[in-house]
Amino acid sequence: MEENEAVCWGQKLAKELKVVLPISFYEKEVNNLYNSVACIDADGDLVGVYRKTHIPDDHYYQEKFYFTPGDTGFRVFDTRYGKIGVGICWDQWFPETARCMALEGAELLFYPTAIGSEPILACDSMPHWRRCMQGHAAMNLMPVIAANRIGREEVKPCVENGGQESSLIFYGSSFITDETGELLQTASRDQEEILTETFDLDELAAKRLEWGLFRDRRPKCYGKITE
């Protein structure tokens, strides 16, 4: 990982700009490949790595051909500016991801993403995708920051992908919500953009205590979730 080009670039940039960066990269360990995120602190140091838990497999997202399900568990990284939980793409569709990170002390939820519209099915999943994460914010009283790529990508038939052919238009639409799920900042579908927002983490922590959502949880009643 120390030699990964994206991670090394992220470390230099984080140190230069004094920012925290979750950097996506492909991680190899012996014979296993993982879809991973390296969390880099504002001094350029590596805080830790999260390996994607949920691995999709359908006509457009063929990750099970390549990636092993992550073994790190959900991670929360204690950085210079706060505690951040990071899920990767398909992880964002599972409420368990957000709740586990919240229970581990996250103050902000990040979801680096690569998702798009499927021309063959004439399907635009963007509104559903966005509402799903707005729900995570509202249920955990925690801001969500989701970054999605843009552009078109063609997949040609080959042995490695089982002879499948498809194309995907990544629809961008990155966004930031407040702790109730309300959209504060949104990006376009086809342009590179930078979104910024300011949060008072102490104020947000006080709101979570006031609502009592975590106080009133009853984990012994949730056995079905782990079956």
Specify the residue positions occupied by each region the protein language model found.
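Short, structured patches in soluble enzyme cores that scaffold and shape functional sites
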Residues: F25, C39-D41, R51-H54, D78, ...
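A short, polar/charged loop-to-alpha-helix boundary motif
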Residues: K52-Y66, Q191-L209
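Cysteine/selenocysteine-centered motifs that mediate thiol-based redox chemistry or coordinate metal-sulfur cofactors
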Residues: T72-E104, L204-E227
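Active-site beta-strand termini and strand-to-loop segments that position acidic
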Residues: D41-A42, F77-R80, D178-E179, F199
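Short beta-strand scaffold segments in enzyme catalytic cores
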Residues: I23-F25, S36-C39, R75, S174-I176, ...
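Short hydrophobic alpha-helix segments
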Residues: D43, V49-Y50, A187
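CN hydrolase (nitrilase-like) catalytic-core segments centered on the catalytic cysteine
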Residues: E2-P22, K83, C89-I194
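Glycine-rich acetyl-CoA-binding "A-motif" of GNAT/NAT acetyltransferases
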Residues: L33, L46, L183
